[in-house]
């Protein structure tokens, strides 16, 4: 249905209200996608503010979004037994996609804004990371930077922690 609407109106924007990654085979045929997660009672007002440009999106994805359900490692066993099988070990989320080389639609940490930012003066002092962030765009906006430390992981694989 989304593809049919987008074909009739090239300015279609899809608003996703969901608590996890979902398949979005129509993603390339719409003008925009606004992922709201589970926004609660003020969600409608937040959507309106974002769509009308009163505020700029600044969130980042907390998980990788696969292209299809079949790209999820548990898809091969889910529903085939009454037992819960946790065969992935530490290879869940981005770790699985990284290790297996499976392409994802949107990676962990992905997010867009109506504005742009410049970064400078990166410093690292032990566990403290600092960076100067400057809004270089035409819209007011906030930026959410995530910095990760690598752990040696299992069998020499590095993991974000």
Per-range role (PLM):
Residues 140-147, 159:
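Short, hydrophobic/aromatic beta-strand segments
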Residues 17-142:
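Secreted, periplasmic, or luminal enzymes acting at the cell surface/secretory milieu
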Residues 7-12, 30-31:
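A short helix->loop->beta-strand "cap" motif at the edges of active sites that frequently abuts
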Residues 1-6:
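Cysteine protease catalytic core and zymogen-processing segment of caspase-like enzymes
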Residues 72, 149-161:
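Short aromatic-acidic-glycine turn motif
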Residues 9-11, 121, 135, 151:
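Detector for Asparagine
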């Amino acid at each position: 249905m989304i593809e049919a609407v987008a074909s009739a109106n090239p300015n279609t924007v899809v608003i996703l209200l969901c608590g996890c990654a979902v398949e979005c085979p129509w993603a390339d045929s719409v003008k925009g996608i606004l992922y709201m997660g589970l926004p609660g009672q003020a969600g409608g007002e937040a959507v309106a503010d974002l769509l009308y440009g009163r505020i700029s999106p600044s969130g980042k994805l907390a998980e990788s979004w696969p292209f299809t359900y079949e790209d999820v490692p548990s898809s091969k066993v889910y529903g085939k037994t009454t037992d819960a099988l946790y065969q992935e070990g530490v290879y869940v989320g981005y770790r699985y996609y990284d290790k297996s080389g499976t392409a994802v639609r949107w990676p962990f940490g992905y997010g867009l804004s109506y504005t742009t930012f410049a970064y400078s003066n990166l410093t690292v002092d032990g566990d403290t990371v600092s960076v100067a962030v400057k809004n270089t765009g035409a819209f007011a906006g906030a930026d959410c930077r995530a910095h990760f430390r690598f752990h040696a992981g299992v069998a020499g694989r590095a993991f974000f922690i």
